[in-house]
Each structure stands twice: as C-alpha cells, then as structure tokens.
Amino acid sequence: MANIKSQIKRNRTNKKAQERNKAVKSELKTAIRATREAVATGDKEKASSALRLASKKLDKAASKGVIHKNQAANRKSAIAKQVAAL
C-alpha cells in the first residue's frame, strides 16, 4: 500500500483507467466477433453493417489511446478483407 498522497491518487486513477480500457477492449472483441460471425454465415448486409460498427469502435479506441493506431488499422484491414471476400 502506498503511503505518498500523490501515489494513492495515481493508484485510484490507474484503476479507473484500467476498468475503462477493459470495457472498451471487451466491446472491440464483441464487435469484431460479430463481424466474423456474419462473414461465416455469408450474410453480406449484416457483415458490412457489423464492419462499419467495428471500424468505428476501433478508431475510437485508437483515438482514446486504448490500442495503438497501427493495431487498429491492422484489425480493420483484416476484417475488411474478410467482408470483401464475400
């Protein structure tokens, strides 16, 4: 346990950020999974709308600093490639 006042506050803010980042990453995984499932079923309409949502969430996570912008770009291109193959 930290004794310094500033470190106690940092621990508190780090915990909040960790919970927020965990929630965002969970949403990302769900959105990407939904896109991949739509691709697996062969539903082009559903896949393209899921891709749009996943891309939006990836961009938002990258802008907030939850994931790196290059990682967001790589994930977007990977799922876009799968949707385009339909």
From Swiss-Prot:
Pfam families cross-referenced by the UniProt entry: Ribosomal_S20p (PF01649)
Protein's name according to its UniProt entry: Small ribosomal subunit protein bS20
SUPFAM superfamilies, per the entry: Ribosomal protein S20 (SSF46992)
Functional summary from the UniProt entry: Binds directly to 16S ribosomal RNA.
Region Disordered, residue ranges: 1-27
Gene: rpsT
Gene Ontology BP terms: translation
Biased segments, Basic and acidic residues type: 16-27
InterPro entries (alphabetical): Ribosomal_bS20, Ribosomal_bS20_sf
